[in-house]
Amino acid sequence: MNSRLWNLEKDYDTLVKWWNQHDFDLPVPKDVLPPLGIIIEEDNVSICAAGLYEDYKRTKFGFMFGLFTNPEIGKIKLYKAMNNCLQEIHKLAKVKELGLVYTITGENALFKLYEKNNMTLVENNTRSYVMNVQQENYNDLRWIMGNDIIETVNK
């Protein structure tokens, strides 16, 4: 398996394809994804990806956004690729001189993977909120909502 920095101009269509295959309500808008990210590939097939936000003022705090996966990949290969992706995010964070990388997940399947990669559970009962500063550009937030919230909004 190989890793590379993602290039949203090239890789965004792949991410959208994965999100559609996973039945996401909407794709994540390209302009809110971080310019930094990692793609794991094998034989020119993208397997998984994660984004890394960093503060342009060089704070020591980063945010890993997503661990997006190709649903056509088998579980064993996918697990290895996700593990590699986390290791590459760690390396990228070191290069960018970040001290901490924060992430959130509601996916039970990722808990053990994160812990195996020395990530520390810091909150177990959290609600996520977004302040929509540009409602004219982001009037539909289903791409960031959990299914339980989407169900209540659609009622």
Walk through the language-model features, giving the residues of each.
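Short amphipathic alpha-helix that is part of the acyltransferase structural core
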Residues: 1-28, 140-155
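A short beta-turn/loop motif at secondary-structure boundaries
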Residues: 30-32, 56, 106
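Terminal substrate-recognition subdomain of acyl/acetyltransferases
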Residues: 42, 94, 102-155
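Acyl-donor binding region in acyl/amide transferases
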Residues: 60-118, 124
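Solvent-exposed amphipathic alpha-helical surface segments
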Residues: 22, 26, 92, 96, ...
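Generic alpha-helical hydrophobic packing signal
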Residues: 3, 46, 62, 88, ...
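A short helix-loop-beta-strand connector motif used in the catalytic cores of GNAT acetyltransferases and
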Residues: 26-48
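Conserved beta-strand in the GNAT
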Residues: 39, 45-55, 60-66
